[in-house]
Structures are given as C-alpha cells and as structure tokens.
Amino acid sequence: QVIASVDEQGREQLRTGGRFLDWPTSQNEPAINAGLQALVIMSLEAGEQLEQVLKNDSLSSLCRTTVERMRQAIPDYKQSKQSAALAALAGLAAPEQCNEILSEGGVERYSTFYGYYMLQAKAMAGDYAGAMDDICRYWGGMLDLGATTFWEDFDIAWLKNAARIDELVPAGKVDVHRTYGDYCYKGLRHSFCHGWASGPTAWLTEHVLGVTIVEPGCRVIRIDPHLGDLKWVEGSVPTPYGVVKIRHERRKDGMIKSQIDAPKKVKIIR
C-alpha cells in the first residue's frame, strides 16, 4: 500500500486517513507534504532491509527503486523545523543546511515530539553543543517551571511571567496549565506527563554517553561520546547479558577518559 501511494514523479500521495505530522504543523500543508515524503522514504528504506533479511529479493528491490524515484522529488522542507529535521534524517537535504533552519530563533518553534528528530538532525550536522543547549533551554524550561515529567506541548514563550506548576499561582503570575495549550489539549486538558516528549533521554544516551547498538541483541556496542561543555557524564545501558556501565570524564588536556564496565559477552568498540 505504501509503495502504491507513490506516483510516477516520486511524490507520496498518501490519502488514507488524515495527513498529519504533529499538532503544531497541522495547518502547515507544505510542511506536512515534506515531512510525509521523508517519512515514506525512511519507511521504505527500513522495509528494504527487512526484506533482505527475509530473502524477499523482489520486494527489497521494489522498495529500493521506489526510494530512488522519491529522492528525485525534493519537497519544500524549509517551512518548519519538523520538516527540516525529517529532510535531514531521510537524506533529502544536507544536515548542515537543515541545521540552519533548526537554529533559527533558538528553540522557538520546537515541538515536544519532533524535538527528538530535531536533535538527531543537529547531531548529523555535528552540532552536538547546539543540541545540548536546546535541551537545556526547551526541556529545561519545563523543569524550571516545576515539571517532573515532560509535557504534551510546550512553547518557550510560556516562561514569561509564569508561575511554577508545583505552587499556588501568586497574584500577577500566569497559570501555565490553565492559560496555555492548543487544539485538543487546551487549558487543564493539557497533559503534563507525556512519553512522546521524552526524546532527550534516548538522545543523551546515544550521543552524549555515546552508545550505539551495532549488532542485534546488543552483542556489539560502539561508544563514541560527545560531552560538549560537560566535565563528566555517567550512565548505564541494559543488555540481555547484563548492564553496561559507562563514565566519561574530561581531562585537563581536553581529552576524554572513559571507564566502561561491560559483560563478557558484549564486545565494546571505541
């Protein structure tokens, strides 16, 4: 069905159900079109890999040739940070070029769900420091207001004159929960505990702690940390063979000293 939705010019023509990326872009048709083009490409690339494992050469080839056709139809991905991030991840545009769009206005026009993909695109561009700063400002903004879990939606502008959510609202302060939200989550219906806003947790493990699973079952793990301006970072990753414990420290000469404790059946690549 997905392959059948791609026309001869390589443009996705998904029409079953609503065309949607996230609520903040729901009125931005060019962004939706660009985002769906990127998502279909990534889906078919994953499909090609799966069919190779299943020895289905004909369907694997069909996925590949469809993606090649789609790459000739470059959408207008510059209409939102969501579509710019997806364009980078799908290989439709240079990550450095997309990062220029993602960096405009700092974390203005970020979104809680696609924020993860924005961080991934910035990492592809080598802008780890910028991504970490965005985490501090955007997700840190929620923490500054008393959050203990991340929210369904957040706009950096909400910080202005805002009361914390863990205290009674003082006179003259803005009640963030009652005042903000949009679409189907206006006012007190706005969730303050939303799993899809937790992307930085995975991103920090992958890029700051530096963990990439290389082989199925976690038999081989690559560790390549990016500390930014942090002096140290510490974390752990569960595997079927036990927990991998990792600590990185920045030495005075700027080099990173790593301490890695891994189960014997897990091979570590540095």
Name the predicted role of every residue range.
Residues 1-38, 51-89, 93, 145, ...:
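Active-site acid/base region of carbohydrate-active enzymes
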Residues 78-83, 109-115:
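Generic helix N-cap/helix-start motif at coil->alpha-helix transitions
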